[in-house]
Amino acid sequence: MLNIETSAEEQLVLRKYNYPTEHADSLRAEMAVRQLINTLHSDGYLLASTVSRTKVNNELRLRVSIGEKFAWLKLSSGNVENSLLRRSGYKQTQFEEKPFRFNQVARMEKSLLSFAERNGYPFASLKLDSLRIEENQIGASLNLDLGPLILFDSLDIKSDFTLKARFLGNYLGIVQGSPYDQRKIDYLGQRLRNLPYLRVSEASTLTFQNSEATVHLKVQKRPVNQIDGIIGFLPNSNKSDGLLITGQVDIDLLNPFGSGKKIGLHWQKLSEETQNLNLLYAHPNVLGSPLNFDFAFDFLKQDTLFTKRIFDLKISYNLGGNSFLNAFSSSEGTNLIGTPKITNNELPSVVDFDLTSYGLGFDWNNFNDPFLISKGTGFNLKASTGNKKISRNVGLPSAVYQGVDLKTLQYTFDLNFQNYLRLKNNFVLVNKLRGGLKANDQLFRNDAFRLGGLKTIRGFNENFFFATKYALATLEGRLLFDESSYLLLFSDLAYLRGEFKTSPTSDWALGLGAGLSFATSSGIFNFIYALGSSQNTGKFNFNQSKIHFGYTTRF
């Protein structure tokens, strides 16, 4: 039992503070009293102290003297420049004949020193100078000692593979000759974890010598260059018996020249007549700047209906840590392969068109690993607008284009959210939410988002669904054997709507299944069994189940 005694006048002050009176032992009671005294000091009662203590049976009695509350006489700016004071939140009126609050001074000190640390002065210090006390008022002036200007030296890198110091310095923002910035040091670990082709073998260290700061890194090569092959065995809907074999090849080369670049080639054979090719080139820190350049080309042949080609150019800027602001442009063109039959002088479900769009995006994540994610959250947003031009096809009657606006504005929005929650050492709960929207009065099937298959709605053929707006939620549980081997159970639930000019559609789709992923000495093997059901395709049918094999080699 804790009993705090004060004078009758000070008891009025003490009533404003809540403190527990019941404690398991005297040590915890003493800690509660110290916390109370510290709070009184922070609120301006600088002379508050414990005068005496007596312990009687289970009761601890303390006599506390609170004293007078101090106020500012005046806190002058001293030698601190006005621009720095404004950044710290300092206002003269807050420190002139106002109650003295220690936390207010501490916040200002932290803000000033943080600004100094970010601008080349890691050894800056702040103190109160010309201190004077008149009765219960305090007067002082600020005295900021910046210390020596510190510049970054070149990175000291010890690695067992080719990694150019100039590239890594630009990527980390630690450029030789630039002012020291504590934020770059704070973000160092996370930024290095985002590089999939290396592993930090020892904690980084920082040394200061001759007004220069040197960051020492020791990293090892991580085998992440990939050659992935997936074979799928699906029932062939065009034949009463037999299987349709689909395939996919993914080649990703990361850091091929020691400067962080990425080269990718991805090919898919989705059905007998459908194939897709994607090429990617990523160039980080162009000309030593914080800008990253990505170029992508995608080509799709959809059955005997149409071909589609997309050129994408993206420039991203690192906002700090793992936040990126993106600006991108896209040039999209699609052409009919054959001429569909026209029976009612209306446009077919696919048309020839060109679309040039521009947009902005934002990416952020705090994943614990770029590939083998077991903890963290990430999301990205994209929005774009562009001019769409429908081209007249000479194989179609001119009447089908009457009343059709051939030049329109088209809007596209994308959202992708992922969360990996590690509930126990060997169990991870994965939540994902994806969504997309295309807005235009002139939308056709070759405008649509394509969903279905191993990377979107499992239990369905690859790119089975066409949608101009969709929402996809994934819930997945993983039982880990190690960081790269696990059993999984999953569900994919999607709402899909196609607001096409010719024939609007809507559907709900659900995919359920289980799988296994395990690592070998040369790669990772994946096996997934999935069932799919939707309003338009009917209930779950084991005869239409999907089996996916995958093997990823890394070198």
Question: Where are the language model's segments positioned?
Answer:
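Periplasmic polypeptide-binding modules associated with outer-membrane biogenesis and secretion
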Residues: 1-8, 16-237, 246-250, 264-273, ...
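Internal, well-ordered alpha-helical segments in soluble enzyme and binding-protein domains
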Residues: 108-112, 354, 358, 413
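Well-ordered beta-strand positions
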Residues: 132, 318, 517-519
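Short helix/loop capping segments that flank catalytic or ligand/cofactor-binding pockets
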Residues: 152, 227, 370-371, 389-391
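Short acidic/His/Gly/Ser-rich catalytic and metal-binding motifs that mark active-site loops
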Residues: 163-167, 335-339, 388-393, 442
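Gram-negative/organellar outer-membrane beta-barrel architecture
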Residues: 181-380, 451, 464-467, 524-555
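C-terminal transmembrane beta-barrel domains of outer membrane proteins
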Residues: 246-250, 264-269, 273, 278-280, ...
